[in-house]
Amino acid sequence: MAGNSIGQIFRVTTFGESHGVALGCIVDGVPPGLWLCENDLQIDLNRRRPGMSPYTSSRRESDQIRILSGIFEGKTTGSSIGLLIENKDARPQDYQSIKDLFRPGHADYTYQKKYGIRDYRGGGRASARETAMRVAAGAIAKKYLFEHFSIEIQGYLSQIGTICCEFKEKECIEANPFFCPDPHKVEEIAELICALKERGDSIGAKITIMAKNLPVGLGEPVFDRLDADLAHALMSINAVKGLEVGEGFSFVNKLGSESRDEMTSSGFSTNYSGGILGGISSGQPLLVHLALKPTSSIAIPAKTINQQGETVEMTTSGRHDPCVGIRAVPIAESMLAIVLMDHLLRHRAQCGHF
């Protein structure tokens, strides 16, 4: 399995499985001299971790991060930073009864066909549990981007099912378990999630991530355009099935005369392109929307096949999120931060300035 790393200069390599001993990652390319402690990473990990509310997975993981290397006297040294999280609430026995079945909508079938072997315990490497290490690495990038360039990254739930959440109050995002920016929609979302849990079903979602105060110049045309690398990184998040930058698919219904982000001496008049032009950051706020499919592991029986190719009916037990889009918010923020950090260092290496 060769696809465990992302980035060229700021490079993140993760390892570990959902119900294995631990999760870990190596972060290369962190500039020396950055004040960094475990709590800097723990804040975002707590936003992602399961068991934090009755609306997400009941798996109770503390996700306590350990920094194993790359820090001396509280500062980064420029060497590889090793990070580790032990799995404390793994329950592989939950999957014993379905180990010979391919859960519909999961990676079980494709992993088995590709590798001839798979870790059936919660999907193993294919589980979203792996993303804990992306969040830890992303927290390092976020800290550097903010402290050195005042770049702010914010994500939020913009739609769940038919409930649309407008960006009304930034403070509201962290004040509810759904990362919802509209205080008037929180109760409605809670009722939806409770109804889904009662029925044993799940729902899809759309999340939005933003970056403010970006300099002009991030992105390496033609194949490493900023939006191309963002698509690569964000589409690697479990359950993400769609992505749009700025107006995205809405451009289909627009005229060129009304959507070209005209400029004046005062700056851009609009930001339909979401802060990226020609694959390079324009200095405007970067705006990306992600669509996530509903959780496939639900209590409603479904048809599938076993390893012998026979049609069977199965019900998935275990501890699963009724909407994976909720906990995907800090994951998407982290992947955005990782890509921006890598492109910032690449730009500085080639051009030497902003």
From Swiss-Prot:
It catalyses: 5-O-(1-carboxyvinyl)-3-phosphoshikimate = chorismate + phosphate. GO terms for molecular function: chorismate synthase activity; FMN binding. GO terms for cellular component: cytosol. It is an enzyme of class 4 (lyase). NADP(+) binds at residue 48. Its cofactor is FMNH2. CDD domains: Chorismate_synthase. Reduced FMN (FMNH(2)). One of its GO terms (biological process) is amino acid biosynthetic process. Pathway: Metabolic intermediate biosynthesis; chorismate biosynthesis; chorismate from D-erythrose 4-phosphate and phosphoenolpyruvate: step 7/7. InterPro entries: Chorismate_synth, Chorismate_synth_AroC_sf, Chorismate_synthase_CS. FMN binds at residues 125-127, 238-239, 278, 293-297, 319. Keywords: Amino-acid biosynthesis, Aromatic amino acid biosynthesis, FAD, Flavoprotein, FMN, Lyase, NADP. It holds the Pfam family Chorismate_synt. Its EC number is 4.2.3.5. This reaction introduces a second double bond into the aromatic ring system. Homotetramer. Belongs to the chorismate synthase family. This is Chorismate synthase. It comes from Hamiltonella defensa subsp. Acyrthosiphon pisum (strain 5AT). The gene is aroC.
